[in-house]
Design a protein with these regions (language model features):
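Active-site metal-binding loops of divalent metal-dependent hydrolases
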Residues: 52-55, 105, 127, 187-189, ...
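Core dinuclear metal-dependent hydrolase active-site scaffold
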Residues: 7, 37-42, 48, 158-200
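Metallo-beta-lactamase
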Residues: 75-108, 120, 125-184, 233-258
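Conserved nucleotide-sugar donor-interacting segment of glycosyltransferase catalytic cores
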Residues: 110-120
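Conserved beta-strand hairpin/beta-sheet module of binuclear metal-dependent hydrolase folds
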Residues: 3, 12-85, 195-208
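Cap/insert and terminal regions of metallo-dependent hydrolase folds
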Residues: 71-85, 201-275
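Feature marks short, surface-exposed loop/turn motifs that line or immediately flank catalytic pockets
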Residues: 14, 56-58, 129, 212-214, ...
Length: 275
């Protein structure tokens, strides 16, 4: 039985200037970015989330997210868009979510972890270490309150994986080892990963924040100036980020019929994956 994948927006953000961030729209019009979350129905392992978007605790008390994030991202706080609310709207219960796979632990990706306290949280080992022991520069991106409930962490180390379209692939879930893979894509953070998922239409790759705009994977790469600046402001290693972005572009162009690649914040890609 193939996996069934739901594509959710669990946190719309409206930073200033659509023209500079989305590449279209007015100079004074707010931009639109999304938090693209996957909810996966599995035959035997319950539900699996890939990322969580903005969670109910932070929606109820936005000050938890910090003044800088609020001023820059200008999120729309809607309890109905949280992953836990959308899980319920689909007829499930929060405890049905047995696994959460995070691309990384930035506050807009891990905010919903407390809404699923029984879930096992899968993360790439270098990302876990970076978040638990942040340096002065990375403290702003990680929010310890989002894991104050002591999640059931499952850390996955590099090595011992297999090749997946030229990338390293780690198997986080033994029962779904043929259908879900962690794909290290370092650069945005020290332990950033994509998550490859196979459904009845083939492979898809949730690339997290390895890139931000669909035009970056085009034959003639392009990107709005404001979003390019933001991408550089939040990167950890530019050389690795650009190298992995270029590898993703090659993957998307060379295997367009085999792999659907999308990132975490592009509303155009979210709409395309929803069909």
């Amino acid at each position: 039985m193939p996996l069934r994948v739901h594509h959710l927006d669990c946190g719309t953000m409206c930073p200033a200037c659509a023209r500079l961030m989305n590449g279209r729209g007015g100079w004074l019009e707010p931009a639109k970015l999304v938090c693209h979350v996957l909810l996966i129905e599995t035959p035997r392992d319950g539900l699996v989330l890939v990322d969580t978007g903005l969670g109910s605790l932070d929606v109820a008390d936005p000050s938890r997210l910090g003044a800088a994030f609020l001023a820059l991202s200008r999120p729309q706080f809607d309890a109905g868009r949280t992953a836990v609310a959308q899980v319920r709207a689909l007829g499930f219960q929060p405890e049905d979510v047995r696994h959460i796979i995070v691309t990384h632990l930035d506050l807009d990706h891990a905010s919903g972890l407390p809404d699923f306290p029984l879930a096992q949280v899968h993360v790439f080992e270098p990302e876990f270490q970076a978040a638990m022991k942040p340096n002065w520069r990375s403290k702003a991106r990680y929010l310890p309150a989002q894991w104050a409930h002591s999640p059931r962490w499952s850390c996955h180390a590099a090595g011992g994986g297999e090749r997946w379209f030229g990338f390293e692939g780690l198997r986080p879930l033994p029962g779904l080892q043929d259908d879900i893979l962690l794909v290290p894509l370092i650069g945005h953070t020290l332990g950033h990963c994509g998550v490859a998922v196979r459904d009845d239409a083939g492979w898809m790759l949730h690339a997290g924040d390895a890139y931000f705009y669909h035009g970056q994977l085009a034959e003639q790469p392009h990107m709005p100036a404001g979003l390019r600046l933001f991408e550089r402001l939040v990167e950890t290693d530019r050389r690795l980020r650009e190298r992995n972005r270029d590898r993703l572009r090659e993957l998307a162009l060379s295997h367009a019929g085999e792999v659907r690649v999308f990132c975490a914040h592009d509303p155009v890609e979210l709409a395309g994956m929803r069909g």
